[in-house]
Regions:
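Alpha-helix-loop-beta-strand connector modules within alpha/beta enzyme cores
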Residues: 139-150, 201-206, 280-286
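Hydrophobic faces of well-ordered beta-strands that scaffold small-molecule active sites
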Residues: 75, 123, 151-153, 174-176, ...
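Non-cysteine beta-strand/loop elements that form the S-adenosyl-L-methionine
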Residues: 168-183, 253-262
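Aromatic/hydrophobic pocket-lining residues that form the small-molecule binding cavity
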Residues: 105-108, 135, 199, 203, ...
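Auxiliary Fe-S-binding modules of radical SAM enzymes
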Residues: 1-43, 211-302
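Anionic-ligand binding region
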Residues: 187-218
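Conserved radical SAM core fold
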Residues: 95, 132, 157-160, 178-196, ...
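Conserved Radical SAM active-site core
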Residues: 47-173, 182-183
């Protein structure tokens, strides 16, 4: 299966998408924060970023979901900064403290091609939202030099439908992390307004574009939606409503990775309710609930 950008778009169309995305940076509305920062003129957005791209690391990753990892790894590019401000972020040095190095569009294109050369199964863009125009610029260069891997958009779910529509037929695999169904908690712990309604609209748009996750005969992800959800202590995430949304409004064939690896990090120690690992029973409760809703892809229901 060809990547969507080779199957659906011409090079002039891809360049037009990049130009349209760049217009969203002028008074920034690339994400639902809509902070209006003039990033193209050197102002810093809510994401702590100007127009220059910063990357913390590039390489094959073997800790992602099995359909992404395959045998040779997922070709991850970790972008610095984030449009969320999660107080328990486990990658806070990258997302909040700005760890990373400046990368031109040529650098980024070169990284994509290197990941392809070493055999990675995909280009996995980690926290790409705030740099999506520049990423498409780099994709143009990489495609001209032979890139033919599927693109994974690995994000925190706080996405603008306007931006997502400009990414249609560019992204093959959307991988949003649905963090909360409780807006009050999204504001308190991640600093964003109206998260629940926003993430639902975004995930519906993603699914409309790419459908349920499709695998090759070897079990490698080729196209579709893969949803993540991290169970938080004391049900701070509102996990059952997230499961209901996926099962009832997306598809019971959704690949849903219900994650149990929460550990207190960054500023979690400030919040007693966040300052512990989840219990086995908290996790099992969500898994059992998802199984009863008919969801089985992405986790062991037993």
């Amino acid at each position: 299966m060809l990547p969507l950008y080779l199957e659906k778009l011409t090079m002039p169309e891809l360049k037009q998408r990049a130009e349209a995305l760049h217009q969203l940076l002028v008074e920034c509305r690339i994400c639902p924060n809509e902070c209006k920062a003039k990033r193209t003129e050197g102002e810093t957005g809510e994401c702590h970023s100007k127009v220059e791209v910063y990357i913390s690391s590039v390489g094959p990753h073997f800790g992602e979901e099995p359909p992404l990892v395959g045998t040779n790894g997922s070709g991850t590019i970790f972008f610095t900064n984030c449009n969320l401000d999660c107080q328990f972020c486990q990658n806070y040095d990258i997302s909040h403290l700005g760890m990373g190095e400046k990368a031109s569009k040529s650098d980024l294109a070169r990284s994509m091609l290197q990941l392809q050369q070493i055999g990675c199964h995909n280009i996995n863009l980690v926290t790409p939202t705030h740099f999506s125009p520049q990423i498409v610029d780099a994709l143009v260069l990489a495609i001209e030099k032979g890139l033919e891997l599927p693109i994974v958009y690995n994000c925190g779910g706080y996405e603008s439908v306007e931006t997502l529509r400009l990414l249609e037929d560019i992204v093959d695999i959307y991988m949003p992390d649905i963090k909360y169904s409780i807006d009050e908690n999204a504001l308190k712990y991640s600093g964003v307004q109206n998260y629940w309604e926003t993430v639902k609209l975004a995930v519906k748009e993603m699914h409309q574009q790419v459908g349920d996750l499709k695998l090759s005969k070897r079990g490698i992800a080729q196209r579709g939606l893969l949803v993540r959800h991290l169970v938080l202590p004391n049900d701070i995430a509102g996990s059952k409503a997230v499961v209901d949304f996926v099962a009832d409004e997306i598809s019971t064939d959704t690949y849903l990775n219900i994650m149990d690896q929460y550990r207190p990090a960054y500023h979690a120690n400030i919040y007693p309710e966040l300052n512990r690992r989840i219990t086995p029973s908290e996790y099992k409760d969500v898994i059992d609930y998802a199984h009863n809703k008919g969801l089985i892809r992405g986790f062991d229901p037993n």
